[in-house]
């Protein structure tokens, strides 16, 4: 019985996830908080309280808290805290945010180990991906 050689090329892909584009006005910068999955809960509470204290200086009536992906649960938990404990009016908006991922296609794994090809020289491709998100508006 003859052994078959594996003749297909193995190409590996490395995905680099990029954050969403943030187009905010000067007023929105001072009234918007972005929550990541790694943001500590208590730090986010303190930051929101600080923004709520200075929201009148910015001429706004609410603070927007934005979270997407894994941070949706933490963002909603922050909203529940301000609604239940602080008796603030909360509005919740769901969103779908499109982000771009950079996919780097590498040739055969054996060839790449030996060659000194830099990351800039490899074939890159951008792929669009939709991520779910939530926006909380906490009113003063």
Curated annotation (Swiss-Prot):
Start and end residues of each stretch annotated as Disordered: 1-21
Keywords carried by this UniProt record: Hydrolase, Nucleus, Phosphoprotein, rRNA processing, tRNA processing
A GO cellular component annotation in the UniProt record: ribonuclease MRP complex
Chief location bin: nucleus
Modified residues (Phosphoserine): 115
InterPro entries: Alba-like_dom_sf (IPR036882), Pop7/Rpp20 (IPR014612), RNase_P/MRP_Pop7_fungi (IPR020241)
Catalytic function, reaction form: Endonucleolytic cleavage of RNA, removing 5'-extranucleotides from tRNA precursor
Localization terms from the record: Nucleus
Signal peptide boundaries: none
A Pfam cross-reference name: Rpp20
rRNA processing among keywords: yes
EC assignment: 3.1.26.5
Keyword Aminoacyl-tRNA synthetase: no
GO molecular function: ribonuclease P activity; RNA binding
Domain of life: Eukaryota
Top EC category: hydrolase
Example GO BP: tRNA processing
Oligomer and partners: Component of nuclear RNase P and RNase MRP complexes. RNase P consists of an RNA moiety and at least 9 protein subunits including POP1, POP3, POP4, POP5, POP6, POP7, POP8, RPP1 and RPR2. RNase MRP complex consists of an RNA moiety and at least 10 protein subunits including POP1, POP3, POP4, POP5, POP6, POP7, POP8, RMP1, RPP1 and SNM1, many of which are shared with the RNase P complex.
Family: Belongs to the histone-like Alba family.
Its biological purpose: Component of ribonuclease P, a protein complex that generates mature tRNA molecules by cleaving their 5'-ends. Also a component of RNase MRP, which cleaves pre-rRNA sequences.
Protein name: Ribonucleases P/MRP protein subunit POP7
Organism: Saccharomyces cerevisiae (strain ATCC 204508 / S288c)
Lineage, broadest ranks: Eukaryota, Fungi, Dikarya, Ascomycota, Saccharomycotina
């Amino acid at each position: 019985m003859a052994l078959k050689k594996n003749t297909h090329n193995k190409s590996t892909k490395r995905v680099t996830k990029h954050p969403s584009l943030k187009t905010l006005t000067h007023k929105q910068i001072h009234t918007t908080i972005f929550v990541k999955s790694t943001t500590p809960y208590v730090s986010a509470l303190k930051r929101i309280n600080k923004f709520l204290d200075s929201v009148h200086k910015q001429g706004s009536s609410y603070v927007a808290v934005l979270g997407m992906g894994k941070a949706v649960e933490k963002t909603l938990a922050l909203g529940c805290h301000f609604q239940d404990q602080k008796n603030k009016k909360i509005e919740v908006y769901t969103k779908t945010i499109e982000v771009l991922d950079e996919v780097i296609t590498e040739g055969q794994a054996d060839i790449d180990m030996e060659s000194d090809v830099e990351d800039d020289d490899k074939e890159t491709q951008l792929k669009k991906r939709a991520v779910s998100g939530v926006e909380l508006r906490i009113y003063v």
